[in-house]
């Protein structure tokens, strides 16, 4: 199975950024790819998405999420709740092993494989193997610097990559 990644997102005011590393690990012990793109803009560039977990599962969920955005005219909150509901109830989707962070200029959500939707109180989220390190770094940077969300997300991922063996420094940062 391919997995292991780190995604971090930071929202300050109406600015939001998401960053992901590029490493894809196969079977816990082999780097298969070093420059994968695990973050993207969807819905005409108005929504950011980052995913971690099984690659095929994450892509499937991202596609489902895009469908929900289209059905709900870009309403992020409604789309993410409907995705989570479908994820929990569908026998096939329920088996997918992935996590997603989705964000726009108004909201930032983490959607879990068990169908949970969480909007972090501090507008900072991180998922994947290096998630705890990236989250701690991002929180420290938000509290102690005046950096922009994109700079915070990138720096937090760099810190995570220096600690987590499943995270690398080939970082993609997207912002709104």
Swiss-Prot record:
GO terms for biological process: proteolysis involved in protein catabolic process. One of its GO terms (cellular component) is HslUV protease complex. The keyword Membrane does not apply. Its EC number is 3.4.25.2. Pfam families: Proteasome. It is found in: Cytoplasm. Allosterically activated by HslU binding. It catalyses: ATP-dependent cleavage of peptide bonds with broad specificity. Its main location: cytoplasm. PROSITE patterns: PROTEASOME_BETA_2. The keyword Ribonucleoprotein does not apply. The active site is at 5. Keywords: Allosteric enzyme, Cytoplasm, Hydrolase, Metal-binding, Protease, Sodium, Threonine protease. It comes from the Bacteria. PANTHER family: ATP-DEPENDENT PROTEASE SUBUNIT HSLV, METALLOPROTEASE TLDD. Protease subunit of a proteasome-like degradation complex believed to be a general protein degrading machinery. HAMAP family: HslV. A double ring-shaped homohexamer of HslV is capped on each side by a ring-shaped HslU homohexamer. The assembly of the HslU/HslV complex is dependent on binding of ATP. Belongs to the peptidase T1B family. HslV subfamily. This is ATP-dependent protease subunit HslV. The lineage of its organism: Bacteria, Bacillati, Bacillota, Bacillota incertae sedis, Caldicellulosiruptorales.
